[in-house]
Every structure is written in structure tokens, then in C-alpha cells.
From Swiss-Prot:
Residues 401-476 form the B5 domain. It is an enzyme of class 6 (ligase). The gene is pheT. This is Phenylalanine--tRNA ligase beta subunit. Gene3D superfamilies: 3.30.56.10, Bira Bifunctional Protein, Domain 2, Ferrodoxin-fold anticodon-binding domain, Nucleic acid-binding proteins, Phenylalanyl-trna Synthetase, Chain B, domain 3. Belongs to the phenylalanyl-tRNA synthetase beta subunit family. Type 1 subfamily. Its main location: cytoplasm. The lineage of its organism: Bacteria, Pseudomonadati, Pseudomonadota, Alphaproteobacteria, Hyphomicrobiales. Binds 2 magnesium ions per tetramer.
Length: 804
């Protein structure tokens, strides 16, 4: 919301300075976002260059004799390439502050020649980036006058950021009212008397709506005959330009002016272009309207229009139509002031993608009691600027506003804010804000004014009292100290999340944050798409479902990087997925994707050989590393071949703890999945469920036991077993490990071989077994006994035999 200082003072009688006004606005909750005070240029003078001679000691400098209008030329040294005799520019004198250079001018010598000022460029004055030369004004610019006055920069522009509840401050009068209540002046009475019209308005208004649920709660219409519509006066144009509006013509500018002045949107129709009466009704499916922004909008039955016999002439409360717009040929004008349902305005504006000053105000809620005065203000301006003869104002469907009454115990201020405010002060503040007040010394019975539709209860009155009384008057208090924090601060799941995140980052993966919303097609490709997980009001068509997996978002992110030249990339995310619409169906998951050659050991080409494409074992290693970091008992995890349908059936696995607890899945992606997501390249991924990891058993002692290291040398033994081709290597590893759990501390597969020499349907799996004796050195007899145990265990559990 922008306004100029002089515009504010039309409503506020005050002697406060600009700085005081700006500070007070922020204090009372109307936060000032910017102040454009070009009046700071008032010290700079328009001056004419009389002569320009070359500097005696510098080829690129000139010595100028400058006329400032007082008959006493000033000598200035200047290096601008466009400096010349006859140029009219802007002179800064000693003592003037130059904002673009952040310096204060003084008399100085430049290469031995005194300079008594500076001819300025636009960038040096900080109102544009132009710096190719000094400012070159029109030849008839008045020499000796203030540059700020000449440019119309005497009026500072203030911009405030409004919260959605403060609809009353979408007009400058509302801002002035708050400042007056805060003690910074007196609110002027600027509302005019009703304009006396002659004769009825020939165009009637028909409200075609459900009387029990109206979308238009009032409509005022008046015709002014015989107007002369030309440019608006200079003062109005300057104010509109200052707040970023483009002057069009007097009639249109008046509606814009009243919109910002009073927070009361209006519209004007060229009466000659309106056929028959005006009907406020729902739009018909397929109807179109060419709006004032020169765009054609397709309407539907959920929208509302003001129509005549030709069809829609205005999108109600949002934007008028081009067909009935006012131009320089307008003679008879219809002035409209109406009340619209804020929800209807917001919905229609959102569907059509239209943002206007009228929509901004109506969807927040305008003052219902300003409908008629707003029309009177506009009528008075039309008569002053365009002439004409008004008819009687025709008001349809309006019912007087019923004020809300709130019983407000003043003790609520102390209870909710800790601020001590007396009954008398609270009473006075609410009265100054326009509330009707009466009370018994303890409780104030407050009648909410029509312009404060956001005040609904006691807490809102506390806010009003507090912001006017002054938040800065709250005494600062130190936070109470309760000593050291006892016990654990983070939950188990938070600790697991932190550890998993650090582990995956340490493995060369980059953390990503993807949307929790994905398209229906993506959701179905990853086991989702349930009706209860569809968004009621999605922000986009491709963000309609809550994600059942982290992998769709990560795959899309990896592909976007690949499209931009980053083919080898590893991404991970630790976040939530959704299996249902209840809290227990939201799971905490760590997921990751590797693409191209983005392996742990490095990606791309290097002197010792090119990195191979990522595959199932890279995803498996990531999944196990994340689970181990999160505290899962990885030594007890079982790995089953195969995974969910979005993974390759022969190159994927499932990590389980017992027959029921699934800790995660990993593998390469199914080609159909990649095609559905429009993703290509070598890709693998994983997901581990951090909330499925069992809680560790409680330990009797908080300290870790002493580390016990064996004093005896460890040793390794290799074994090769011939097994059926369907036997998994993991089962052989488990069988070997179970032969002697105390002595065998590690088993690793180092070779898998298939060939005719083994027989049809057979394969050889070779493992390295790490042995660690604890109490003595192993003898040959001990190793022989252990070998027999290993062979017997493998034969029993897998049917394998020792390869000869």
C-alpha cells in the first residue's frame, strides 16, 4: 500500500515530521517497507552552463562557468563528455549531500583549478543508473529553481506492508485514523454531504440471486449526465503516478483515486453503451468478456457478473468490461458502488488469474457503511472535474450494518500480553480507534465499527489496545534459568534422522529437498494414488497427490540436473512419505538415487580406468550404511531378492529383520518406471524406513564397557562351495557364519563362477573367512575341526559341497 505524505495530510492534521510518521506507523503494526523521499534533492539547483573551456592541465576535464539564477556565475570543474555551453543541468553546491556517491560536497581543487560545486548525473543523485553524462534538462527549465520542485519530488512516498486482516488500511483514511489514535495528530472530517440529484436514474439494477445466500449485499447506482471527460487535473495525476498507477482519463482516475483514498472500490460505465437495465447475476457457462486489460476471459456458472441486454459488462467486484468503458467521448456516466461477498471475489479472481486493486480490497472485506458515501465522494469529484447533472442515487439490496458488541474485561490485556494498561487508557484507546465504548470501570462494552470486520473477540481488542499503547513499552525480562538440561533432548527418530543424513552426505551424496506433492501418475507408479491422499485444492495439476515414496522427486531432480549437463549425480533426502491419511501412516524415510557413474569412490573418467555405471550393489551399500548409522542391527538383517514393482525384479532386494519387519528396499529401477517418469540413464536407488528400526534394549550402565582386544593373531581361510544356481550368496555367508559364531568374525564373498565343469544348474561361491581366536593360538587340528563344521553347516543349510 503506497501513499504520499501530502495525501495522508489530507486526512490527518499533524505537525509530525516524516521520520516521526514512519516510526509511528511501524510501532502500531503498519510496517513501513520503504520511503522514497526525493525531496532530499531540494538543495540541488537547476543551472545553465554559460561557458565551457578545456582544463589547462587535463585533456578530459573542462572548466565550466555556471549560471545559478542569482547573477553570480559559479566555477565548476567537470569531466562529463556532454558538458557544453548552453546545457541546462543540476548543480550541487558545497554542503550538499550526494546520495549516489555518499559524499558531502566541499570546495576543492582539481588539478590546480578550484571547483565550487558539481554538475550531477542521474546515478549520482540515485534516481536512475544513467551515468554516461550529466543531467541534460529542457532548454526552458527555470534556472535557479529547486530541482526537486521542478521534477515534482517534493512529496515523499511511503509504502507499508499490510497484513490480510487490516482491510481498513487499504485506504489512506484508515491509515490516518490509526495515526490519530496513536496520538500523532487529529483525524479530519473529509466526508462530503450527500449530493442532491434530480430525477431517477434511468438505468435500473436487478439483483438476480438467492435471497438466503446473497453474493451482492448492496448496490448503489447514479447517472451523471452531460459530463466532459478529459485528462484529470495535474494534482490527481501526480498522486496516482506516485503510487504506481497510470492516469487514463478523469472518470477512470476518479474511481482509482477514491479506491486508494477511502479503500472503497468503484466502477464507471459509459451509459450510452449500456443496453437496458443492469442485472447482477451468475455467469453462464461459456460466456466471455473482453475486460479493461484487453484480455478475453471465459466465465463459468460459479462466477458473478454485472450484465445488460448485450451480456456481461463487468466481472463483479474485480474488473470492468472494455465494451462499456469510459473514454473521451463519454457524455453520460453511471457510477457504481457495491458490496460483494469476499469469498466469491477471491474464488473468481483466483480462477481467472486476475489481480486488481478492487479484488485486493473486496476479498479482504470493505466497510459496508462506505458504499453510499463512496458513491457520493465520486459524484462530487465528477461534478468538480467533469461537470454534469446528477440523478438521485439508486440503492438496491442494502441493509444497514449490524455492529458486533464485545464485552471486554481489561484484565485480558495483562493476561495475554503481560502489559499493564489501566481501564482508562484502554477505554480511551478504543474510543480513539472508533469503537463505541461504555463500561463499569472493569469491563468495557465495545461496539465494533463497520470498518473493522477483523475484530471478532476479546483477543482482537487486546491487540488493538497493545499496538496503540506501544509494544515498545513492554519492559524486557530475562528468560528464567533452570540450570543444565536434564536427559536427552532429541527423540530417537530425530537422532536416527541426523545420523542417517550425515552418513549419506559422507558417502558423496548431496541432500535434496523435494515437494511432498506429486502427480497422480507418479504416485501410482510408486504404489500410491489412494483417494484419501489426493489434495482437495492442489496448487498445480502435477502436484495433486501426497507422495508414497521419496524416489519420484529424487528421480525428477536427478533428471533435471542431467538435462543441464550434470550426468553423474547422487542425491538423498530424509523426510516423510504418506501411506494413508492418519498420523500413524506418515513414515520417516531416508531415500537416495545415484545416476550415471556417481559411485562412492568417484565418478567419470580417470587415469586408472573409467568408473562403471551405478548398479544394484551401490544402492545396497548406501541402504546398509544408512541403516547402520541410524542404529539398526545390520548383522541380523536378512536380504531377500526382489523388491517393489518400481524396481527391477532381478536387480533389487528387500532388507528385513525377521519375517515381518521391512527396513528398506534397494535396486535398479524398472524400465517401465523410468519411462513413466520420463527419466533415462543408469539409475539405482534405495529407501530405508527409519521408524521401523527397533528400539535398542535399555542398558544397565550409561558408560560403554571396556574395549577388549584379542592378544592373538587373526587369520583367514578361503572356501569354495558348489551350490545350485538358485542359491543366494547371502545364504552361504549365513551358513558359514553360524558354524562358530565366537571364532568366525567375518565372511566375505570374493568370487562367483559358473561353467560346464561344475555341471548344469550349478555355480561356485568362494568366500573368505576371518577367524579371531580369543584365548589361544589355533592349531592345525583346530582349523581342521572348524573347516568340517563350516562344510557341514553349508551342506545342511544350502545343500552345497566343498569344491574340489
Amino acid at each position: 500500500m503506497k501513499f504520499t505524505l501530502s495525501w495522508l495530510k489530507d486526512h490527518l492534521e499533524t505537525d509530525a515530521t516524516l521520520d516521526e510518521i514512519v516510526e509511528k506507523l511501524t510501532d502500531i503494526g503498519l510496517e513501513v517497507e520503504s520511503v522514497d523521499d526525493r525531496a532530499a534533492f531540494r538543495a540541488f539547483t537547476i543551472a545553465r552552463v554559460l561557458t565551457a573551456t578545456r582544463h589547462p592541465d587535463a585533456d578530459k576535464l573542462q572548466v565550466l562557468s555556471v549560471d545559478t539564477g542569482d547573477g553570480k556565475p559559479v566555477q565548476v570543474v567537470c569531466g562529463a563528455p556532454n558538458a557544453r555551453a548552453g546545457l541546462v543541468g543540476v548543480l550541487g553546491r558545497p554542503g550538499d549531500y550526494v546520495p549516489g556517491l555518499d559524499v558531502t560536497l566541499s570546495v576543492g581543487k582539481i588539478r590546480g583549478v578550484e571547483s565550487f560545486g558539481m554538475m550531477c548525473s542521474e546515478r549520482e543523485l540515485d534516481f536512475s543508473d544513467e551515468h554516461n553524462g550529466i543531467i541534460d534538462l529542457a532548454e526552458n527549465a527555470p534556472v535557479g529553481t529547486s530541482f526537486a520542485a521542478y521534477m515534482g519530488f517534493n512529496d515523499p512516498i511511503i509504502e507499508i506492508g499490510l497484513t490480510p486482516n487490516r482491510a481498513d488500511c487499504t485506504g489512506i483514511r484508515g491509515i490516518a485514523r490509526d495515526l490519530a489514535a496513536a496520538g500523532l495528530g487529529t483525524l479530519k472530517n473529509t466526508l462530503p454531504d450527500a449530493v442532491k440529484g434530480e430525477g431517477e436514474t434511468p438505468v435500473k439494477v436487478i439483483l438476480d440471486q438467492d435471497a438466503g445466500n446473497p453474493f451482492c449485499t448492496g448496490f448503489a447506482l447514479r447517472m451523471v449526465k452531460g459530463v466532459k471527460n478529459g485528462p484529470s487535473p495535474k494534482w490527481m495525476q501526480q498522486r496516482l503516478k506516485a503510487i504506481g498507477l497510470r492516469p487514463i482519463n478523469a472518470l477512470v482516475d476518479i474511481t482509482n483515486y477514491v479506491t486508494f483514498d477511502q479503500g472503497r472500490p468503484l466502477h464507471v460505465f459509459d451509459a450510452a453503451k449500456v443496453k437496458g437495465n443492469l442485472t447482477v447475476r451468475t455467469a453462464r457457462d461459456g460466456e466471455t468478456i473482453l475486460a479493461l486489460d484487453q484480455r478475453e476471459y471465459k466465465l463459468n456458472a460459479g462466477m458473478y457478473v454485472i450484465a445488460d441486454e448485450n451480456g456481461p459488462e463487468s466481472i463483479a467486484g474485480i474488473m470492468g468490461g472494455e465494451h462499456s468503458g469510459c473514454d473521451e467521448n463519454t457524455v453520460d456516466v453511471l457510477i457504481e458502488s457495491a458490496l460483494w461477498d469476499p469469498r466469491m471475489i477471491a474464488r473468481t479472481g483466483r480462477e481467472l488469474g486476475i489481480v486488481t486493486d478492487a479484488r485486493y480490497r473486496f476479498e479482504r472485506g470493505v466497510d459496508p457503511e462506505m458504499m453510499v458515501p463512496g458513491a457520493e465522494i465520486a459524484t462530487k469529484l465528477v461534478l468538480e472535474l467533469c461537470g454534469g447533472q446528477p440523478t438521485v442515487l439508486d440503492v438496491v439490496g442494502y441493509k444497514p450494518h449490524t455492529a458486533r458488541v464485545i464485552d471486554f474485561p481489561v484484565t485480558e490485556v495483562k493476561r495475554l500480553t503481560g502489559l499493564d494498561v489501566s481501564y482508562e487508557d484502554a477505554f480511551d484507546i478504543l474510543k480513539r480507534l472508533g469503537f463505541g465504548v461504555e463500561g463499569d470501570g472493569k469491563t468495557i462494552r465495545a461496539t465494533v465499527p463497520s470498518w473493522r470486520g477483523d475484530v471478532e473477540g476479546k483477543a482482537d481488542l487486546v491487540e488493538e489496545v497493545m499496538r496503540i499503547h506501544g509494544i515498545n513499552r513492554i519492559d524486557p525480562q530475562p528468560l528464567p534459568s533452570h540450570g543444565a538440561v536434564n536427559g536427552r533432548i532429541l527423540t530417537t527418530l530425530q537422532i536416527r534422522t541426523r545420523h542417517a543424513r550425515r552418513m549419506l552426505a559422507s558417502r558423496g551424496m548431496m541432500e535434496a529437498v523435494t515437494y511432498s506433492f506429486i502427480s497422480e501418475a507418479q504416485a501410482k507408479a510408486f504404489g500410491g494414488g489412494k483417494p484419501e491422499l489426493k489434495l482437495a485444492n492442489p496448487i498445480a495439476a502435477d502436484m495433486s497427490d501426497m507422495r508414497p515414496s521419496l524416489l519420484p522427486g529424487l528421480l525428477a531432480a536427478a533428471q533435471r540436473n542431467a538435462d543441464r549437463g550434470f550426468d553423474d549425480i547422487a542425491l538423498f533426502e530424509v523426510s516423510g512419505i504418506y501411506e494413508g491419511d492418519t498420523p500413524d501412516k506418515q513414515r520417516r524415510v531416508a531415500g537416495g538415487v545415484r545416476r550415471g557413474t556417481a559411485k562412492v569412490e568417484g565418478a567419470g573418467r580417470f587415469w586408472a580406468g573409467n568408473a562403471a555405471p551405478v548398479g544394484v550393489f551401490d544402492a545396497k551399500a548406501d541402504a546398509l550404511a544408512a541403516l547402520e548409522a541410524a542404529g539398526a542391527p545390520v548383522d541380523r538383517i536378512q536380504i531377500e531378492a526382489g523388491g517393489p514393482e518400481w524396481l527391477h525384479p532381478g536387480r533389487s532386494g528387500t532388507l528385513k529383520l525377521g519375517p515381518k519387519v521391512v527396513l528398506g528396499t534397494f535396486g535398479e529401477f524398472h524400465p517401465d518406471t523410468l519411462e513413466a517418469l520420463d527419466v533415462s540413464g543408469a539409475l539405482c536407488g534405495f529407501e530405508v524406513y527409519l521408524d521401523a528400526i527397533p528400539e535398542p534394549k535399555a542398558k544397565s550402565a550409561r558408560t560403554k564397557p571396556a574395549l577388549s582386544l584379542s592378544l592373538f593373531q587373526s587369520l583367514k581361510r578361503d572356501y569354495a562351495f558348489v551350490v545350485d544356481a538358485a542359491v543366494e550368496a547371502g545364504n552361504v555367508v549365513k551358513a558359514v557364519s553360524s558354524a562358530d559364531k565366537k571364532l568366525i568374525v567375518g565372511v566375505q564373498v570374493f568370487d562367483i563362477f559358473t561353467g560346464a565343469s561344475l555341471g548344469e544348474g550349478k555355480k561356485s561361491i568362494a568366500v573368505e573367512v576371518l577367524l579371531q581366536p580369543q584365548d589361544r593360538t589355533l592349531t592345525d587340528e583346530d582349523l581342521e575341526v572348524l573347516s568340517k563344521q563350516i562344510v557341514a553347516s553349508v551342506a545342511k543349510q544350502t545343500g552345497g559341497v566343498l569344491r574340489g
